[in-house]
């Protein structure tokens, strides 16, 4: 459906907008070490979402994307409340994170959930089971992504051959 297509395209548009904004501000992301390498947990997660979206029923692809929307909506809500009570306003990512706690973003999340429900209603039990599996796997990957960031997990250095 067109609405599902829009939900798939939104994160891509946001990412491109961020790159363009950084470039317009004179920041060159290619020079930033944070952007030189995609970390393992991120690579695993985005490839899993892409695999589900590309090779599975559209409902399964949508289910694989939902944890990202839903988790960030919840985290955004918590952050907005915490921001009012603490020094989190000084966090350099405060505005970006607070955007995930906005009523507009929550409305988009509800739209994504509605699309997933509508897609599920049109499928059989086999596809619904695949949706559940994709959703739970993506939830685990979301947790792993955050844990990896918290613990600073990255690629192991590759030794040069002697």
Set out the residue ranges of the language-model regions:
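Short, small-residue-biased leader/transition segments that mark boundaries at the very start
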Residues: 1-8
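Active-site-proximal alpha-helical scaffolds that flank and shape metal-associated catalytic sites
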Residues: 9-107, 140
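Hydrophobic alpha-helical segments
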Residues: 72, 79, 115-122, 138, ...
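Long amphipathic all-alpha helical oligomerization modules
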Residues: 102-136
């Amino acid at each position: 459906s067109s609405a599902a297509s829009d939900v798939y395209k939104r994160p891509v548009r946001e990412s491109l907008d961020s790159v363009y904004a950084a470039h317009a501000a004179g920041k060159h992301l290619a020079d930033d070490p944070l952007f030189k390498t995609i970390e393992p947990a991120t690579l695993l997660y985005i490839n899993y979402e892409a695999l589900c979206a590309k090779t599975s029923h559209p409902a399964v692809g949508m289910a694989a994307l939902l944890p990202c929307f839903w988790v960030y909506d919840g985290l955004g809500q918590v952050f907005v409340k915490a921001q009012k009570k603490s020094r989190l306003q000084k966090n350099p990512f405060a505005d970006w994170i607070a955007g995930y706690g906005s009523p507009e973003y929550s409305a988009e999340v509800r739209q994504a959930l509605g699309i997933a429900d509508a897609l599920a209603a049109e499928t059989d039990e086999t596809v619904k089971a695949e949706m559940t599996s994709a959703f739970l796997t993506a939830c685990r990957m979301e947790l792993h992504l955050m844990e990896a960031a918290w613990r600073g997990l990255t690629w192991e250095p590759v030794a040069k051959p002697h």
